[in-house]
Design a protein with these regions (language model features):
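C-terminal lobe/tail of nucleotide-utilizing enzymes
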Residues: 1-7, 181, 185, 196-303
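Nucleotide-state-sensitive switch-loop elements of NTP-binding domains
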Residues: 2-13, 21, 26, 31-141, ...
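P-loop (Walker A) phosphate-binding loop of NTP-binding proteins
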Residues: 18
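Structural beta-sheet core signal
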Residues: 43, 142, 188-190, 220, ...
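Residue-level recognition of beta-strand->loop/alpha-helix junctions
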Residues: 45, 76-78, 192, 221, ...
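Conserved nucleotide-binding/hydrolysis micro-motifs of P-loop NTPases
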Residues: 48-51, 79-83, 146-148, 194-198, ...
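Short, surface-exposed alpha-helical recognition segments that flank or form part
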Residues: 113-120, 193, 197, 256
Length: 303
């Protein structure tokens, strides 16, 4: 089965990676591809700076679910509002729910309880794919926080289940932990760049997922790779014969960056034997055209 078809069978796809590697762009590209596979897809962003709409060519979400294409919607979530929404869902009496949310005890608990906000976001995604929410989807693509925080998010339900024990919150945490640990339901996509620090973080996250959750990611994406500069014949000194002499230094820098990419890809391959999608550097402005180009390149890699 091709990797894209395998991902399309999941109900939740969590995309994580070091900040600055193009994680949000890859999440948006995956959402677009899964929608093209016939799956009703919701893209979830939890960054308060809200940038997903720039790629999709829509208005900012502001917390609302916006249509972003055929079978594709997008939403920006604020973790605190999701926790409050969970209270309203579990406490059917509106006045009582409002009183609970306004209480100092709840405020302290919501801000300080380890893993609560992360679990609330994952629970929101689960209710959507289980058709228990007014917004419904076949698959949710979650643009998760950067690497370490992304791993903590995935581990949050299990940690919270151990901390709270029984009750509705404990039951919900255990249900979520089982859902995330099952690769039939939840897929993890790790985005990196073939540079020293991003690859090191990727290697550490792969190990962390195996240790904490007993499973590796489904897919690793190496983004923004410099193209092979061997299309020019000879060495840097020969480049000036074919191009403006001012390009020689640029071409040499290009060659060196490509060497770094190849070295780090070999290091990554030393610990990762699964699917590794390699995407080229695309010098384009952030927007729908960039998203279309990244989605096309990713689809080619996942055939």
């Amino acid at each position: 089965m091709r990797p894209l078809s395998a991902l399309a069978r999941r109900q939740l796809v969590v995309v994580t990676g070091k900040g600055g590697v193009g994680k949000t762009t890859i999440a948006a590209a995956l959402g677009r591809l899964l929608a093209a596979e016939g799956r009703k897809t919701l893209l979830l962003e939890i960054d308060p700076r809200e940038s997903l709409h720039q790629l999709l060519g829509t208005e900012p979400s502001g917390g609302a679910v916006l249509k972003a294409g055929t079978r594709l919607s997008a939403q920006n979530l604020q973790p605190r509002s999701v926790v409050e929404g969970l209270v309203r869902e579990k406490v059917p009496i509106g006045a009582l729910a409002k009183k609970i949310i306004a209480s100092p005890v709840f405020q302290h608990f919501a801000d300080g309880a380890p893993g609560l906000k992360e679990m609330a976001i994952l629970g929101y995604a689960l209710r959507i794919v289980q058709r228990k929410h007014r917004h419904k989807a076949d698959v949710v693509v979650l643009d998760a926080p950067a690497t370490g925080h992304g791993a903590s998010m995935l581990a949050a339900p299990l940690l919270l289940a151990d901390a709270v024990g029984g009750g509705q919150l404990g039951d919900m945490a255990r249900e979520l932990a089982a859902f995330i640990a099952d690769p039939k339901h939840c897929g993890v996509v790790l985005v990196t760049m073939a540079e020293e620090m991003p690859v090191q973080e990727a290697i550490e996250l792969i190990a962390m997922l195996k240790e904490r959750m007993g499973r590796p990611p489904e897919l690793v994406v190496a983004n923004a790779l410099y193209p092979d500069a061997d299309w020019r014949t000879g060495g840097p000194a020969d480049a000036g014969k074919k191009f403006d002499p001012g390009l020689t230094d640029i071409l040499e820098l290009w060659r060196r960056r490509r060497e770094v990419n190849e070295k780090e890809l070999r290091r990554l391959r030393g610990v990762w034997e699964g699917t590794l999608a390699q995407l080229p550097l695309l010098p384009m402005d952030r927007g729908p055209e960039l998203l279309a180009a990244v989605a096309a390149a990713l689809e080619e890699e996942l055939r």
